[in-house]
Amino acid sequence: MATESSPLTTHVLDTASGLPAQGLCLRLSRLEAPCQQWMELRTSYTNLDGRCPGLLTPSQIKPGTYKLFFDTERYWKERGQESFYPYVEVVFTITKETQKFHVPLLLSPWSYTTYRGS
C-alpha cells in the first residue's frame, strides 16, 4: 500500500556531534483566524535520521501561517548538556498548498540555523 508523502518535512542535525538529532520532540501548529490563536496539528519526534515524516498529509495543508516548535531544552538535557535556547520556534507562511516545504534545523547547544530547504 502506497503512503502519501508529506508536503511539509523537517530534518534536524545536531552540529555539536555531527549526527542527526534523534528523538527531538516537536510540535506543528497553524495560526487560526479570526482569533489569531495557534492550533496544534501534530506532536512528533525525530527519527534515527533526524527527520519527522508525515507531519501533514496533502489533504491537511492549506495556505496560512505555521509554526514548528522544537523542544531543544529536553533534547540537550537528555544528553547531559547545558544549552542556551530552551526551545526553537520556526514560523513560516504557506501560500500555495500544491508546493512542498522543507524546514531544516541545524542545532547546537549555543546556536541554531534554519532555512527553507528543497
Swiss-Prot record:
Homotetramer. GO terms for biological process: adenosine catabolic process; allantoin metabolic process; amide catabolic process; AMP catabolic process; dAMP catabolic process; deoxyadenosine catabolic process; deoxyguanosine catabolic process; deoxyinosine catabolic process. PANTHER family: 5-HYDROXYISOURATE HYDROLASE (PTHR10395:SF11), URICASE AND TRANSTHYRETIN-RELATED (PTHR10395). HIU hydrolysis also occurs spontaneously, but more slowly. Changing residue 11 to N: Strongly reduced enzyme activity. It is found in: Peroxisome. Keywords: Hydrolase, Peroxisome, Purine metabolism. Its EC number is 3.5.2.17. The lineage of its organism: Eukaryota, Metazoa, Chordata, Craniata, Vertebrata. GO terms for cellular component: mitochondrion; peroxisome. Pathway: Purine metabolism; urate degradation; (S)-allantoin from urate: step 2/3. It comes from Mus musculus. GO terms for molecular function: hydrolase activity; hydroxyisourate hydrolase activity. Substrate binds at residues 11, 51, 115. Its main location: other. It comes from the Eukaryota. Gene3D superfamilies: Transthyretin/hydroxyisourate hydrolase domain. The gene is Urah. The keyword Magnesium does not apply. This is 5-hydroxyisourate hydrolase. Catalyzes the hydrolysis of 5-hydroxyisourate (HIU) to 2-oxo-4-hydroxy-4-carboxy-5-ureidoimidazoline (OHCU). It is an enzyme of class 3 (hydrolase).
